[in-house]
């Protein structure tokens, strides 16, 4: 999220030529066709909101202040403790991650471009968390989304690695992902300051700036996937088995798999099909990457071989919109997602900071009267705040409407607003053509000339020289000023019909009317379509099951003055299936239950002074069975909660399960026909701990015992190794007891709930595939 003035100044200083932006709706294919010539470049500074960094920047510049908050309240959620970061200020805090007794908050200040990094928080006493350290980001860079601590055990490194992204706010800043050794959180050590895609490198840095990252270990190797903000191939995967020497493996553009929905690219705000966030999880033996691809929806990749990812499937947004059926097309904006505990579902979030969209752009007089495609700018005064909820009135052409200055030279002035005569309830509206200067500069020129509203029409290139005559682009804010009027955008065809002329679309052809030409009357109104919300998908089909939003996000009375009421992130409960936690900006922390019957809210928390939650994670302190919910508040720091609603209490204590073992139960067999034994298993889901006592009789001494997944007629995979030795155990004692820690909590919970889906198997040299076996059950 770069400061506007700083971003364009630093690029100019670097001598970077920013090409004309192409329209989001019609020029996605045109952009793609230019990739080879532009070396796969996707500009983050072209005012086309088609990268995560531009979405974040547009959020900062959104029209309608995000001040205010919902009244304080709570239900089934208790605040345990909270702590401000040092130097807390609005918008300083981003994501949260945790390991052991420490949490990590990414901290940034993109406008001033200083004091960015990661705050290290001691949470050993969750009632009294405190900042105990700070990892500084490279000057000119700042972290944000996708902070993570990954526990690695490879030939090259054993310990915990903090992973965070780098966006750029000043010359000297560096992109890519950063890897820090935080095995000793009080003494972090940089392993790799920056790594990523450096072919050909970033606009102003060696590595392309990135928006998010996610790391995982598969077998004896480790990897990280990053969001490349500067190329169409925005899925970048690196090997970090040796985190001090990362190796770039592969890059993908998921639009090559036709994931984009054309209707979404033509409607709503922040149109574009690009990567925003991702997670990776092993599901049924396949390492599966779940990618949130904005208007492309959610995408699954097989990354068993990260150097050669394989497309699995992608989702489609349903028509009409789930929560606003009166809206013809959904907003899109797939922002973040997680797999459910049992991998049957996906909980995804749509981030949407604009609760209104343009209902219609209408020419209301003359021979060409009718409705035409268009949009509303996100940083100007909202149409919905006008007295009648719309703009309507006479128009006049103002040319490019660019300011005269050293950069643009002498520009023809726009006509003064006094040139137009209006009736009561009408607005004086300037029509400008896209090009030469920033959209925001055109709007400021109109504002200074006394106009009540602006219409900015697309130019020939934006209309693909006639192939996309109705394509429009409501771009982002390009310079600092205070908007005081509304602005809408429309296509090049509507521009000519407005002035009753015929477009020629030729390259280099000037077919615009003379400055000062009076046009027909126009009308544009806003349609409330809600803030961003949550979607529940079936993981196998990627079909949507349900959608959810807080009540206020669906109410136009809360469109302004209550902060951002969009969801941001979801965190699936790691133990209890069907429970998840949501960071909901000004909507606070939300707790939902989900399943085949849909989504319902079961808890929430909003402080009396309001909250602004960005990140959310679940966490267990070492040797604790108490689940914590960690949330990062953008304006303060770390907040720690617990859910006090109904949960499965079996997961909070040791629960016993049993298996009677014999050789006749082996599948496919044979087992030892004389063998028998017993397994007593004690399971603690919240601790991720499995304790066992396994005894055997009338078999040769075993060298291993496992818990396998599978019903009684199945030879299933090992899920818990109880013991595994190179040589058989001594003849006596004919039993073994111990505890296994660090077992996946969701797995332990599933064994507790469904013991007959698992069995215990004992192996010896005579029967290496299994001497005796028995199905687990609840005694």
Model-identified regions with their sequence ranges:
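Extracytoplasmic/secreted envelope proteins and their assembly/folding machinery
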Residues: 115, 144, 440-443, 495-499, ...
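Feature marking well-ordered beta-strand scaffolds used for ligand recognition
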Residues: 14, 26-365, 515-653
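Short, ordered loop/turn segments at secondary-structure junctions
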Residues: 167, 351, 435, 458-462, ...
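Metal-centered catalytic cores of metalloenzymes
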Residues: 331, 646-705, 709-779
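Acidic glycine-/aspartate-rich tracts in secreted/extracellular proteins
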Residues: 125, 184, 435-437, 459-462, ...
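Surface-exposed acidic, glycine-flexible loop patches that form ligand/cofactor-binding
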Residues: 152-156, 411-426, 525, 580, ...
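Secretory targeting and sorting signals
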Residues: 2-27
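Structured lumen-facing ectodomains of secretory-pathway proteins
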Residues: 358-529, 533-538
């Amino acid at each position: 999220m770069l400061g506007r003035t700083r971003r364009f100044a630093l690029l100019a200083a670097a001598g970077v030529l920013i090409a004309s932006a192409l329209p989001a709706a019609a020029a996605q294919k045109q952009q793609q066709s230019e990739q080879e010539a532009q070396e796969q470049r996707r500009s983050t500074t072209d005012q086309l909101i088609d990268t995560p960094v531009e979405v974040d920047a547009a959020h900062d510049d959104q029209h309608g202040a995000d001040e205010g908050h919902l009244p304080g309240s709570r239900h089934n959620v208790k605040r345990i403790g909270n702590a401000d970061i040092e130097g807390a200020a609005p918008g300083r805090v981003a994501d949260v991650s945790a390991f052991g007794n420490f949490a990590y908050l990414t901290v940034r200040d993109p406008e001033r471009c200083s004091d960015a990094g990661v705050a290290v928080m001691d949470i050993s006493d969750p009632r009294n968390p405190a900042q105990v350290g700070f990892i500084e980001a490279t000057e000119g860079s700042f972290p944000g989304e996708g902070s993570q601590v990954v526990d690695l055990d490879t030939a090259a490194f054993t310990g915990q690695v903090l992973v965070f992204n780098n966006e750029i706010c000043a010359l000297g800043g560096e992109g890519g992902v950063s890897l820090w050794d935080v095995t000793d959180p009080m003494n972090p050590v940089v392993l790799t300051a920056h790594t990523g895609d450096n072919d050909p490198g970033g606009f102003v840095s060696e590595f392309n700036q990135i928006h998010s990252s996610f790391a995982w270990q598969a077998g004896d190797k480790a990897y990280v996937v990053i969001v490349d903000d500067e190329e169409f191939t925005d899925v970048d995967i690196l090997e970090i088995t040796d985190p001090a020497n990362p190796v770039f493996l592969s890059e993908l553009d998921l639009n090559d798999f036709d994931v984009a929905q054309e209707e979404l690219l033509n409607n709503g705000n922040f149109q574009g099909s690009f990567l925003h966030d991702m997670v990776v999880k092993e599901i049924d033996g396949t390492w599966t990457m779940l990618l949130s691809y904005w208007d492309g929806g959610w995408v699954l990749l097989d990354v068993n071989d990260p150097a050669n990812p394989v497309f699995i499937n992608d989702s489609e947004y349903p028509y009409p919109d789930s929560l606003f059926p009166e809206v013809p097309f959904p907003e899109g904006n797939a922002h973040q997602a997680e797999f459910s505990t049992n991998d049957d579902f996906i909980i995804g979030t749509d981030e949407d900071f604009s609760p209104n969209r343009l209902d219609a752009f209408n020419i209301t007089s003359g021979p060409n009267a009718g409705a035409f495609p268009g949009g509303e700018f996100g940083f100007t005064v909202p149409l919905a705040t006008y007295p009648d909820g719309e703009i309507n009135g006479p128009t006049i052409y103002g040319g490019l409407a660019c300011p005269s200055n050293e950069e643009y030279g002498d520009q023809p002035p726009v006509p003064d607003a006094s040139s137009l005569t209006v009736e009561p309830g009408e607005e004086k509206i300037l029509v400008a053509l896209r090009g030469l200067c920033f959209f925001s500069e055109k709007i400021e020129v109109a504002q200074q000339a006394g106009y009540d509203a602006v219409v900015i029409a697309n130019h020939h290139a934006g209309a693909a020289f006639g192939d996309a005559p109705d394509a429009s682009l409501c771009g982002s804010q390009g310079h600092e000023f205070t908007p005081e009027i509304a602005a809408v955008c429309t296509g090049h065809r509507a521009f000519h019909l407005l002035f009753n002329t015929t477009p020629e679309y030729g390259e280099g052809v000037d077919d615009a009317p003379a400055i000062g030409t009076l046009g027909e009357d126009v009308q544009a109104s806003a349609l409330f379509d809600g803030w961003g919300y949550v979607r529940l998908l079936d993981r196998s089909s990627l079909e949507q099951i349900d959608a959810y939003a807080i009540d206020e996000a669906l109410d136009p009375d809360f469109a302004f003055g209550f902060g951002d009421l969009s969801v941001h992130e979801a965190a699936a409960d790691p133990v209890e299936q069907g429970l998840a936690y949501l960071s909901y900006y000004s909507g606070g922390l939300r707790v939902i239950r989900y399943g085949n019957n849909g989504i319902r809210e079961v808890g929430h928390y909003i402080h009396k002074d309001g909250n602004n939650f960005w990140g959310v994670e679940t966490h267990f302190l070492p040797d604790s069975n108490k689940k914590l919910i960690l949330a990062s508040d953008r304006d303060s720091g770390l907040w720690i909660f617990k859910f006090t609603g109904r949960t499965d209490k079996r997961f909070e204590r040791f629960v016993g399960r049993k298996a009677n073992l014999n050789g006749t139960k082996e599948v496919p067999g044979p087992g030892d026909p004389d063998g028998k034994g017993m397994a007593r298993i004690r399971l603690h889901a919240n601790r991720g701990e499995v304790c066992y006592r396994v005894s055997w009789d009338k078999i040769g001494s075993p060298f291993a015992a496992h818990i396998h997944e599978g019903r009684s007629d199945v030879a299933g995979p090992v899920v818990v190794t109880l013991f595994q030795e190179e040589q058989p155990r001594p003849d006596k004692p004919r039993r073994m007891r111990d505890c296994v820690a660090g077992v996946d909590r969701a797995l332990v919970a599933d064994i507790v709930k469904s013991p007959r889906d698992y069995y215990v198997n004992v192996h010896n040299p005579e029967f290496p595939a299994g001497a005796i076996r028995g199905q687990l059950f609840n005694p």
